[in-house]
Amino acid sequence: MAEQKRRWGDRRDATLLRDVDSLHFIMGIIYPNRADNEAYIAERVNLEPIKDYIATKNYEGIPFKYTFFHVILTALVKTVILRPKLNRFYANENYYQRNKVTAGFVIKKEFADGSEEAMALLEIKPESTIETIHEEIHQEVAACREQKKVNTTDNSMNVLNSLPRFLSKAAVRFIRWLDKHGWCPDFLIGKDPNYSSVFISNLGSIHLKSGYHHLTNWGTSSLFCIIGEKKWTPLYDEHGLVEMQETVDLGLTVDERIADGYYYAKSVRLFKYLLEHPTLLELSLIHISEPTR
């Protein structure tokens, strides 16, 4: 995406949408809070094409295996790039288009009670493929679990937590004011997934079913995706016979202000099409077009 010259009203991370219809102008004023404008989309995905695909990718015994998470995340961010309204948000009653596409998620350092969590944020480029995204996730996870990576967002929270309570509350109120105007410096929010295009959580990895996660008034994220636990489901095959196939339920929470229902419906169809044809994720976006169906 080409860099645009920053104008008055733009944020560091986004461009103010000036030529908008009356509805989108008014909605940010009368419905100013993101958490008050949540809409929910439930989708069930057949994992059989993805299972075959990741088995092929893992055939050579690579140390960091491809998983369903990598495929779903890649398909989702490619959908966001191809459907740019999904990369919009409201802040301070204004309507913005992000300058970049990013994906945020939380890394559990180990599966144990009391284990620490760290935040990860990936920048996705039009030329990104599942291979490049897989490698970036590998680096994020390895650095986090080996505690080599300095996460400025986590460090900022630790500093605030160490202050006297009255000081930390005052500091957080000031930071929230900065957030409202898009003035938070990177040392505070550099790796905060609440500022991502897509915030994704794999609850299936801890054996929980899919649900919905709320949006937050902090940050700018307008799209949250929950991946549930895999399960066997009776489905019709191409001959009309019922057979058990592995599926996963996805729960999408979206800001209903940024796009209409028709736009979301076409976006979900594209997302599922990419999951049904995962080899497309090996192509850069300049070689992917939307399905005509």
Regions picked out by a protein language model, each given a short descriptive name:
Residues 26, 32, 36-40, 69, ...:
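Flexible, Gly/Pro-enriched loop and linker segments at secondary-structure and domain junctions
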Residues 2-43, 49-56:
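Extended low-complexity intrinsically disordered regions
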Residues 32-42, 52-55, 102, 106-126, ...:
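Acyl/amide activation-and-transfer machinery of modular secondary-metabolite enzymes
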Residues 35-65, 90-101:
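Gly/Ser/Thr-rich phosphate-binding loops and adjoining beta-strand/alpha-helix segments
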Residues 286-293:
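Residue-level detector of conserved catalytic or cofactor/ligand-binding positions
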Residues 57, 116-204:
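Helical lid/core segments from catalytic subdomains that handle acyl or acyl-like groups
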Residues 67-101:
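Hydrophobic "lid/gating" helix adjacent to the active-site nucleophile
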Residues 72, 107-113, 207-282:
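Conserved glycine-centered short motifs in functionally critical loops
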